[in-house]
Swiss-Prot record:
Gene: kmt5aa
A biological process term (GO) from this entry: cell division
SET domain mapped to chain residues: 208-329
SMART domains attached to this UniProt entry: SET
InterPro entries recorded: KMT5A, KMT5A-like, KMT5A-like_SET, SET_dom, SET_dom_sf
Organism: Danio rerio
Name the record gives this protein: N-lysine methyltransferase KMT5A-A
Length: 344
């Protein structure tokens, strides 16, 4: 389809070498012929009837044909010696535009003519109006359209929507929750606090959560008055800390008196052997805890300022009212003969 314009200049010519009217002196009915001999014939065709005036182009002395934007293009054909289908090339130049459009339409074959010329009557001209026209842009226009970038439609978004779309990406945890210092403590901090607590209990001699009861046929025993969790500090096995040589001398003295019990506990600390002697009577409860192979407590070393202390911790959860027991670890024959309860 051609764009609607107010006035279009149309130039028509025959595809020959000269581009002139082949009849020269004879009357020519071509609308585009501007020869003086052909002008009367062109004017006679204009006076044929009103039915052809609406679609009839106007001839000018310059060889151009003027037609309005709503009328069809009338093609004027001439027969060549080869009698093949020729194409009529119409050069359309729009007003105020530099890029020309070339339109071609196939030339139908005619079976009759006069002296090699084929003329179109009004009926044929009306039929020719229905023939399609093929528009071809110039080469410069085609190449420029290939390199032309497609235009993008710019859509303005409101600043409020843009802010809302960007806000989720810029959100921080502190926007939802206030900043506060974590109350969780590391494992090393917990161990340090536990050690400080045990140091305080040992240094001050605090022994809570237990009491002494008398057991018939067995003697005194220590019972829990509160539950203890596994690994929790229970009590210190308090006594005199001795080197191995001093401990052996005291043990020989205690052996001379059969009524004296044995409350000496040997252990190693930093590749040295030590002994805690709790034989001397005192109000400390750790020395009164009885022996059992399946006890609920176990011994453990605890150093304060480089000095080892022997303490008892719960080997399992201890309920309130249970007797506190631990394994003495002495399996010698002499000890078992002197104290048969060490077997159990």
């Amino acid at each position: 389809m051609f764009p609607a314009v107010n006035e279009i200049k149309v130039q028509t010519w025959r595809r020959d070498q000269r581009g002139e009217c082949p009849r020269r002196s004879a009357q020519c009915r071509l609308f585009s012929c501007a020869h003086r001999e052909c002008a009367p014939a062109a004017r006679s065709l204009e006076n044929r009837g009103p039915e052809n005036r609406t679609a009839r182009p106007e001839a000018t002395m310059s060889g151009d044909v003027l037609c309005n934007g709503h009328s069809a293009f009338h093609r004027l054909l001439k027969h060549s010696s080869s009698r093949t289908h020729e194409a009529l090339v119409v050069k359309i130049i729009q007003e105020n535009k530099n890029t020309p459009l070339f339109c071609t339409a196939p030339e139908p074959r005619r079976d009759s003519g006069v002296n090699g010329e084929f003329l179109l009557n009004s009926a044929e001209l009306q039929d020719e109006q229905t023939l399609p026209l093929h528009c071809i842009h110039s080469a410069a226009d085609i190449t420029s359209s290939k390199h032309r970038k497609p235009a993008r439609r710019k859509v303005k978004r409101s600043t409020k929507r843009a802010a809302e779309s960007k806000s989720p990406a810029n959100r921080k945890v502190t926007d939802y929750f206030p900043i506060r210092r974590s109350s969780r403590k590391s494992k090393s901090e917990l161990k340090y606090e536990e050690k400080q607590h045990i140091d305080t209990l040992i240094s001050n001699g605090i022994e809570d959560g237990m009491m002494v009861r008398f057991i018939e046929g067995k003697g005194r025993g220590v019972f829990a008055t509160q539950p203890f969790q596994k690994g929790q500090y229970v009590v210190e096995y308090h006594g005199d800390l001795l080197q191995i040589t001093d401990a052996k001398q005291r043990e020989a003295l205690y052996a001379q008196d059969p009524s004296t019990g044995c409350y000496m506990y040997y252990f190693q600390y930093l590749s040295k052997t030590y002994c805690v002697d709790a034989t001397k009577e005192s109000d400390r409860l750790g020395r009164l805890i009885n022996h059992s192979k399946n006890g609920n407590c176990q011994t453990k070393l605890h150093a304060i300022a480089g000095k080892p202390h022997l303490i008892l911790v719960a080997s399992r959860d201890i309920q309130e009212g249970e007797e506190l027991l631990y394994d003495y670890g002495d399996r010698s024959k002499s000890s078992i003969e002197a104290h048969p309860w060490l077997k159990h």
